[in-house]
Amino acid sequence: MRPALSDYQHVASGKVREIYRVDDEHLLLVASDRISAYDYVLDSTIPDKGRVLTAMSAFFFGLVDAPNHLAGPPDDPRIPDEVLGRALVVRRLEMLPVECVARGYLTGSGLLDYQATGKVCGIALPPGLVEASRFATPLFTPATKAALGDHDENISFDRVVEMVGALRANQLRDRTLQTYVQAADHALTRGIIIADTKFEFGIDRHGNLLLADEIFTPDSSRYWPADDYRAGVVQTSFDKQFVRSWLTGSESGWDRGSDRPPPPLPEHIVEATRARYINAYERISELKFDDWIGPGA
């Protein structure tokens, strides 16, 4: 259920976020406690998740050099009290139709592509790589931006050129990889591996390319504890993979290949997911989540 904000017109709903109009140039981006997996929005919610996503994005927007869509601080007076801590005022952009994915390690859909073709998004890789193999240099592996309920599809860089032009495609690749490396280097100093991440970009009215939506959250990134890292096995994680793994495990009783939606998450999975998200934020930022603004769960 989305918050009814009397001062702002509701514009759109995503899997996790609600978007409201502030004025002709600005939007209010509100992160809910919803969680999605395998193209479904689950019936369960994760308490405080929207606040963690907002805190994490705000931290990384301040850390990385890439220009972004923020138009005010997390305590901007334009943010209503009822969504304080889970909302940001952002610039209205023309969003580009590409999910910009940076991969430092082989896992997830990238691993499936590699096992089937020896490539990821058209990039040929050496033989013998395994789950969680580290790449010598990070890869730019874009994907289509699917509608709600559809699957994102990994695409080649040449396809990105066809979609947005060569100049913009090169900007997207360079900005994605530079931003990933900057954040991943920071995370390693905190004992965290950012295995991969995805970004969205938009164009402002002056033609500038801006980083948008969320960045380096446990929803959009894979976080692994560096001390436990070992190639060849599925890694312990502080991200949404924990929920995906439960859904496809025997305890859930759910068949991913069926037409049935996933079951609700049991309380112990909800609590463990909340703890993992908060742990990721506190380790990366060296800040206490209890000090983050806004009403908690």
From Swiss-Prot:
Pathway annotation: Purine metabolism; IMP biosynthesis via de novo pathway; 5-amino-1-(5-phospho-D-ribosyl)imidazole-4-carboxamide from 5-amino-1-(5-phospho-D-ribosyl)imidazole-4-carboxylate: step 1/2
SUPFAM superfamilies, A to Z: SAICAR synthase-like
Keyword ATP-binding attributed: yes
BP term (GO), one: 'de novo' IMP biosynthetic process
Top EC class for this record: ligase
GO molecular function, one term: phosphoribosylaminoimidazolesuccinocarboxamide synthase activity
Catalytic activity: 5-amino-1-(5-phospho-D-ribosyl)imidazole-4-carboxylate + L-aspartate + ATP = (2S)-2-[5-amino-1-(5-phospho-beta-D-ribosyl)imidazole-4-carboxamido]succinate + ADP + phosphate + 2 H(+)
Alphabetical list of HAMAP family matching this protein: SAICAR_synth
Record's protein name: Phosphoribosylaminoimidazole-succinocarboxamide synthase
Gene name, Swiss-Prot/TrEMBL: purC
